C-alpha cells in the first residue's frame, strides 16, 4: 500500500499542487522529541515510541485529533489525554512547517488526492485494473478506503486472508473487512483453504482446538502428503538426519523461569544431536524481554542463536567489513578457487576454522562470516571473486540475506509468516500469554490469535512450556494451553513423551 501510494503521490503531486511532493519524515520519534520540547514535555524514548504508536493508530483508523481525544484509548506514555492531544498537534504543526509527511500521511494524502482529483483517479484506474491483497485480515480502515478508491466501481479484486491471524488490531487492523467480504461483495467466489500443507496432524489439531467456534475460524486438515513426509519410521528420527521428524505436540511444566530456559535449551541440544538443523528450530515468546534467559541458556549449551528483529544481516559490522574486504581483494589476481579466496579474506579478518565454544558477540561474528563462506561454497562452478562480490552487494541492496545456521529466537509477532520444523513456545502462563494488560474480551481474542500464529509456525513438532513459579509467586498455566487438551508433563517426566504425541485430556 505505502509503496504504491508514495509512487502515485510523487508522480501526480507536481501537476495537482504545482510544486514538488513533500519529503518523508525519516524519524518520527526524533520529530516527536522536538514537538515535546515545544509543549514543555520531557519524555524518554520509550514514551515517545508509545506516542508515535498512538499517532499511527489515529491515522490508520481515520480519526481526527478531536475524534481521537474522545475515542477512550488507554493512557499512553503516562500522559493525560489533554497533554497527548497537545503533543500530537505540535507534531503535526512541525511536520507542516517542514513540508513533510509521515508514512500514514502518505496513505491519507493519496486517498485525499484520488477523492478530490477525478482525473487523477481516472488515470490510476486506467493503469491498474486487477488488485490482489494478501493478509487482508490485517488491513486498516485507511488501507481499505484507499483500495476502494483504486477500484472505483469495479470488482476486479482478489483478497487472501485468515481471520484467525489478525494480530495487529493495536495498530488499526480490522478483520471485519475479511469477515464481511461476502456481504460487501455478494458476487464474490469464496474459496476456503482448509488443507494445511505445512504442519503435522498434532500441530493442526492444537491450532483447531484454540480457534474452534471463533469468528472466521477454519477447521484445518493436515495434508496427507505432509503427514507422510513428517511421520517417522523411527520414533527418534529428526529432520535433517536422513529420516523424517517426529510429529508431536507437548506441554511441559517447569518449577521456575531458569529451569524452563535450561530445559528448553537441553531439549534443543538433543534435537541437534539427533540430526536437526539449527535453522529449523525456533523459540517463540510474547515479549522481547523473555529472550534473554533462553539466549543465555542456549549459549551455555553451545547452541548458536539469532534474535529475530535484530540488525539486518548486511548491517552487521563484521559483514559490512567482510564485503568491503572481498571487494578490495576482487581487483587482485585470483587463485581461481572462489571458496579458497573467500576463506583467505575472512581469515585475514579474524575468522577461525572452528567456531568459538561460547556464545555472545564472538560467536555472532563467527556465524556472520561463516554465512558468507557458505554462500561461496554454494556459488555456481566458475564464479569469480569479482562476480561473487557483485552478487553480495546486490543482496545488500535488496536485503536478500543468506540463511544462518542458528536457532531463531523471536517474538510471536515477528514470527508471523515464517515456519520452522520444530517450534518451542515458552512462557505459556496467564500474564505472559495472554499478556497481563489484555483485559477485555477483544484483547483476549487478539492474544488467542497470537497463540494460534505461534502454533501454526511449526511443521513437525510443537513444544509448549511454562514455569509454575516466577518472581512474584505462583503462576497459572495459560488458558490457551488448557484449551488445547494436551496433558501437561512435569519436567522430570518429560522424557516419557519423546517421539510421540502425549495423551490428550488434562
Protein language model features and the residues they cover:
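Acidic, low-complexity intrinsically disordered tails
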Residues: 489-506
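Conserved RecA-like helicase ATPase core segment
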Residues: 141-253
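Conserved helicase C-terminal RecA-like lobe
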Residues: 73, 77, 291, 295-297, ...
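Conserved helicase NTPase motor core
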Residues: 24-27, 75-180, 192-199
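Short alpha-helix plus adjacent loop in nuclease-associated cores
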Residues: 3-13, 165-169, 199, 307-330
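Conserved P-loop NTPase-based nucleic-acid remodeling module centered on helicase motor cores
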Residues: 1-53, 59, 75, 179, ...
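Short glycine-/polar-rich loops that comprise or flank the Walker A/P-loop
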Residues: 153-156, 162-164, 185-190, 245-249, ...
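Conserved RecA-like ASCE P-loop NTPase motor core of nucleic-acid helicases/translocases
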Residues: 134, 160, 193-195, 250-256, ...
Amino acid at each position: 500500500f505505502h509503496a504504491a501510494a508514495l509512487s502515485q503521490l510523487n508522480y501526480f503531486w507536481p501537476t495537482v499542487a504545482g510544486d514538488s511532493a513533500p519529503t518523508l519524515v525519516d524519524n518520527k520519534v526524533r520529530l516527536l522529541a522536538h514537538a515535546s520540547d515545544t509543549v514543555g514535555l520531557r519524555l524518554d524514548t520509550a514514551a515517545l515510541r508509545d506516542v508515535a504508536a498512538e499517532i499511527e493508530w489515529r491515522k490508520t483508523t481515520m480519526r481526527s485529533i478531536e475524534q481521537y481525544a474522545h475515542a477512550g484509548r488507554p493512557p499512553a506514555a503516562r500522559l493525560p489525554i489533554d497533554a497527548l492531544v497537545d503533543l500530537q498537534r505540535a507534531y503535526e504543526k512541525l511536520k507542516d512547517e517542514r513540508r513533510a509527511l509521515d508514512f500514514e500521511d502518505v496513505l491519507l494524502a493519496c486517498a485525499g488526492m484520488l477523492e478530490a482529483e477525478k482525473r487523477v483517479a481516472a488515470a490510476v484506474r486506467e493503469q491498474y485494473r486487477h488488485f490482489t491483497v494478501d493478509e487482508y485480515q490485517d488491513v486498516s480502515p485507511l488501507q481499505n478506503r484507499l483500495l476502494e478508491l483504486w477500484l472505483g466501481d469495479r470488482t476486479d479484486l482478489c483478497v487472501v486472508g485468515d481471520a484467525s491471524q489478525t494480530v495487529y488490531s493495536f495498530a488499526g487492523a480490522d478483520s471485519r473487512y475479511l469477515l464481511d467480504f461476502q456481504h460487501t461483495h455478494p458476487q464474490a467466489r469464496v474459496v476456503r483453504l482448509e488443507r494445511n500443507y505445512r504442519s503435522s496432524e498434532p500441530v493442526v489439531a492444537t491450532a483447531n482446538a484454540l480457534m474452534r467456534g471463533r469468528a472466521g475460524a477454519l477447521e484445518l486438515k493436515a495434508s496427507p502428503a505432509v503427514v507422510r513426509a513428517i511421520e517417522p519410521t523411527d520414533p527418534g528420527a529428526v529432520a535433517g538426519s536422513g529420516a523424517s521428524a517426529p510429529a508431536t505436540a507437548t506441554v511441559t511444566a517447569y518449577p521456575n523461569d531458569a529451569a524452563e530456559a535450561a530445559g528448553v535449551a537441553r531439549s534443543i541440544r538433543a534435537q541437534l544431536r539427533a540430526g536437526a538443523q539449527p535453522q529449523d528450530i525456533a523459540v517463540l515468546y510474547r515479549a522481547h524481554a523473555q529472550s534473554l534467559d533462553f539466549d543465555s541458556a542456549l549459549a551455555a549449551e553451545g547452541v548458536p542463536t539469532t534474535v529475530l528483529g535484530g540488525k539486518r544481516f548486511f548491517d552487521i559490522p563484521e559483514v559490512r567489513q567482510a564485503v568491503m574486504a572481498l571487494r578490495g581483494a576482487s581487483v587482485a589476481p585470483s587463485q581461481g578457487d572462489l571458496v579458497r579466496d573467500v576463506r583467505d579474506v575472512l581469515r585475514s579478518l579474524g575468522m577461525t576454522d572452528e567456531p568459538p565454544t561460547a556464545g555472545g558477540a564472538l560467536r555472532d561474528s563467527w556465524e556472520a562470516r561463516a554465512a558468507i563462506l557458505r554462500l561461496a561454497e554454494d556459488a555456481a562452478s566458475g564464479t569469480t571473486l569479482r562476480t561473487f562480490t557483485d552478487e553480495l552487494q546486490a543482496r545488500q541492496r535488496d536485503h536478500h540475506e543468506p540463511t544462518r545456521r542458528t536457532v531463531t529466537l523471536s517474538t510471536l509477532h515477528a514470527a508471523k509468516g515464517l515456519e520452522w520444523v520444530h517450534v518451542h513456545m515458552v512462557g505459556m502462563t496467564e500474564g505472559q500469554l495472554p499478556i497481563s494488560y489484555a483485559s477485555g474480551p477483544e484483547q483476549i481474542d487478539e492474544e488467542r490469535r497470537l497463540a494460534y500464529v505461534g502454533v501454526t509456525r511449526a511443521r513437525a513438532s510443537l513444544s509448549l512450556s511454562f514455569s509454575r513459579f516466577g518472581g512474584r509467586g505462583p503462576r497459572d498455566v495459560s488458558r490457551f494451553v488448557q484449551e488445547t487438551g494436551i496433558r501437561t508433563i512435569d519436567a522430570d517426566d518429560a522424557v516419557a513423551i519423546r517421539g510421540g504425541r502425549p495423551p490428550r485430556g488434562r
